Structures are given as C-alpha cells and as structure tokens.
C-alpha cells in the first residue's frame, strides 16, 4: 500500500516496499528563540538555510510548522509554504494545530500534501478531515483522544480502529491516505515506551498494512547522545513496520542508519543507493586530502 505525496514536479511514495521516507523536521520554531523572533518580524530567511541543510542531508519531504505565539499563523504558514516550494521541489508536510492555518497552507500548496495531524478526538477529525478530502491530501493520525495518551498497544490499536473507520466511512478518505503516528514517547520518562512503540507499529502493520510515521526525536527527548539513540531506534522501528519519520535530516548518523536499514530490509535493490553514497563520501574525503596536500 502506497501513500502518494507530491510537489508540482516531484512524487514521493511511502510504502513498506519503498525506501524509508525522511521527513525533515527543522522548519519548526519550537525551542528556537531567535527563529521565533525572526518570524515575528516577518523575516523568513532562516527557512531558506533550513531547506538547504535538510536537502543536503537527505530529506525527502519537508515538514513546515509556523506555530509562533503572537503571530498570524495562517498568514505565516501560507508565506512559508510559498517560499519553500519556490526553492525546492521536495513535497511538503503541513504541520499545524490551527485549522485555519491548515486550510491556508493547503490552498497555497501546489501539490498533494501530507497534513500533520489529527487525533482520535471527534472534534479534531470533524474539523480537519473535510479539508483533507477537499484538497486531496493525506493525513497523519495519532491514536490518542481527550481521555489519555494510552501506553498499551491494545488501547492504541483500538483508537487506530476508530480513526480508520471514521476517516474511511464518514469522510471517504482512502485507507492509503491515512498515515498513523503510533506515538513515540521519551524513554527517559518510562523505559518501556520503546518496546510498546515497536509492538504498536507491528500490530498496526499486521491489521491494516498502512503507512506509519513518528516524531523520531520524541524517543530520545531529555537524554544525552540523542543521535546515537535515534540511530538505534529508527532501524528497530523500520523492522517493526515504520515507513517514515519526522526527524533530524541534518544528522549523518541517523540518516546513515536509515539508509543501512533500507539495504537490510531489501528496499535498496542490490544496495545501489548505499554504494553510491559511500563512493560519494570517499570521493569527498579524497578531494579534501588532495586539497590539503597542495597547501
């Protein structure tokens, strides 16, 4: 089963038989005080640098979040999307908790977006799924509701059942366009959340075969050595059935771990992408050494 996300000129497929999809997380003001101040002043120049760094790192889709307090988020998100699609052909994941901002972003986008996100809450689905249908988008869905963020895989799976039923039968969203986020949680707060996540991913794949994503950094939040933890977490999640992640595309360690997992899972045929990347790295090392020798 494939989820199709595309820009005006480029298409990306999410699927269990496809390379793992790296969704760049960087265009997000959360925890970035200077970036927030720039956005409040109407300065979007940092976005251009974020795009360039993530493209160079290997991002395949770019998540865009403009959730800055004391700003007009719909206007800011629309401007950011217009800017990003003017400088890269990578597809976009439109990330907002504000329904009005999502609609402005979807209207501004020249492609088929991934919407981030809905939950199993009835009011959230009622507000956003009509937009997903109207703009022929795909949507990320989280199995939590007003009552709780469940820890048990069985409870999460029950909420996935609800989301799938409501989205497909009440709003006509194709199953392939529902991308479940099984809820990666901080291992520093509870040592069992990693195991629970992998079990949830596996159960969702067995029941529905649909695509899944997560905020990969959530797993290592509050811990030292976050790149190392992410580089262990992601291949294990991929083996369980995860097909994409909103992640730090500027981390060579995590990106390499994902690409290695593609080889091991049989989604990089004959390891050709891995070999090509390795040769490029060796050529860069050789060029740097030769340049140093001539100084």
What is each model feature region?
Residues 1-179, 185-295:
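Domain-level signal for soluble alpha/beta catalytic cores
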């Amino acid at each position: 089963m494939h989820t199709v996300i595309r820009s005006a000129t480029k298409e990306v497929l999410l699927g269990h038989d496809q390379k793992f999809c790296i969704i760049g997380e960087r265009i997000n003001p959360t925890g970035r005080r200077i970036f927030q101040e720039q956005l409040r002043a109407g300065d979007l120049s940092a976005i251009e640098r974020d795009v360039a760094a993530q493209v160079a790192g290997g991002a395949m889709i770019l998540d865009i979040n403009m959730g800055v307090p004391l700003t007009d988020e719909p206007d800011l998100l629309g401007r950011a999307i217009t800017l990003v699609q003017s400088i890269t052909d990578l597809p976009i994941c439109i990330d907002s908790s504000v329904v009005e901002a999502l609609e402005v972003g979807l209207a501004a986008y020249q492609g088929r977006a991934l919407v981030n996100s809905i939950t199993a809450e009835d009011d959230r689905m009622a507000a956003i799924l009509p937009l997903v249908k109207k703009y022929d988008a795909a949507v990320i869905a989280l199995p939590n509701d007003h009552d709780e963020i469940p820890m048990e895989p069985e409870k999460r799976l029950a909420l996935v059942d609800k989301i799938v039923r409501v989205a497909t039968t009440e709003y006509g969203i194709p199953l392939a366009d529902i991308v479940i986020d099984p809820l990666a949680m901080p291992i520093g707060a509870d040592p069992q959340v990693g195991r629970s996540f992998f079990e949830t991913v596996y159960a969702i794949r067995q029941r529905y075969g649909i695509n899944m994503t997560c905020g990969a950094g959530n797993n290592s939040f509050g811990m030292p050595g976050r790149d190392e933890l992410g580089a262990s977490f992601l291949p294990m999640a991929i083996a369980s059935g995860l097909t994409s992640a909103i992640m730090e595309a500027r981390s060579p360690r995590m990106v390499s771990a994902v690409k290695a997992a593609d080889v091991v899972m049989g989604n990089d045929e004959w390891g050709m992408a891995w070999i090509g990347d390795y040769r490029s790295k060796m050529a860069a090392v050789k060029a740097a050494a030769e340049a140093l020798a001539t100084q």
